[in-house]
Curated annotation (Swiss-Prot):
Species in which this protein is naturally found: Coccidioides posadasii (strain C735) (Valley fever fungus)
Residues modified by glycosylation: 182, 238, 251, 338, 405
Record function comment: Secreted subtilisin-like serine protease with keratinolytic activity that contributes to pathogenicity.
Protein name, as recorded: Subtilisin-like protease CPC735_003880
InterPro entries: PCSK9_ProteinaseK-like (IPR034193), Peptidase_S8/S53_dom (IPR000209), Peptidase_S8/S53_dom_sf (IPR036852), Peptidase_S8_Asp-AS (IPR023827), Peptidase_S8_Ser-AS (IPR023828), Peptidase_S8_subtilisin-like (IPR050131), Peptidase_S8_subtilisin-rel (IPR015500), S8pro/Inhibitor_I9 (IPR010259)
Amino acid sequence: MKLLKSSLLLLLPFVTANPIPSEDKDIIPGRYIVTLKDGITQEDIEYHKSWVASVHRSNLAAATAAGRPRLETEGIRKFFQIHKMNAYSGAFDDQTAEDIRRNPYVKSVTPDRKVYLADTVVQENAGYNLGHMSSKGRHSFTYRYDSTAGEGIWAYVLDTGINVDHIEFEGRADSGYNAIKNVSNTDNFGHGSFTAGIIAAKTYGVAKKATVISAKAFDTGSSTYDYIFDAYNWVVKNITDSGRQKKSVVNMSISSAKYQPFDDAVDNAFEAGITTVVAAGNDQRDASNNTPASAANAITVASIRFDNGRSLFSNYGSVVDIFAPGERIVSCWIGGNNATRKADGTSVSSPHVAGLVAYLMAIEDLPDPAAVTKRVLDLSIPDLVRDPGEGSPNRIAYNGIQEMNETVIA
């Protein structure tokens, strides 16, 4: 969240030297995300769905009758309702897409596109990161934290799934939801297990007693907004239906080129009382060019090294809210119930702050996402980031333990 501002996807690879591919290459031909205007009724929505189905059938029939090549498209795929935002994904021929764009109920018709995870890089030496979170940004290999440790808090991980049987989760991991048909809930890629471990693993986690819930939208290093909207829609509904807004945080270590419909979804979740933490991206550029980093009401996290220098790969700029460790980090992996790996990336930085949010929610009464963000920023340590990048805030995440009773883990 950009506090005090007006207010496909690729998993973030754990670090990649490669920037996000060009927008044209990432567009999915014939696939769209359609957002509807604010204020329409449920009756309007049902009428619109029927209208789209009718227009789609008519256009396909007209193409056949005229002897034009007919692109077999399925029409509306999934419908999403995220607080006040109504949207749907669909596969349409060009004429139907244009007809939908002109419909008076429609706000936007945007081509679906790939979203990426951050690439994984294996490096030697790890372990400073948790000490960093409790030592005001200074070098330490001792992690100090309140013994509540995120207990009673739910952290939703929109990613590749979670290795829920990993011993580090101690039974506190749940498969949650899978947006990808004909693919198991299992984490086959590792990225989701790694980020979940930074949030809540007993050894590697910031909030060691929190529960992590998977919302699977990726099975490899890339996905599309069709799946990501579906998974995020489930997360928002699951949190709001259970009344857990003050006890839940969402982590998304993902990135694509700027995609306004999904930024709008994050902002609507914020209005519904949900805190979302996201990665700034690994493209060495202004994060305002990336989604969901550019969402006004996400907490956007950039990466620092062991020495508090901004990571060379990390995005930067005014949409960044805070920095957290993102290099030489060890966490949970796949391939066994005790597997681990080391990795770099803003994908790694984001769950440090998601874990911090879970940690703070367990010990303080934070009534809404604005209060959560303010508390995270108020606790942060200023002026230690070297070369934060043009427009970036100079703030490092800190858990505030020196102002609280503490438990010491050597």
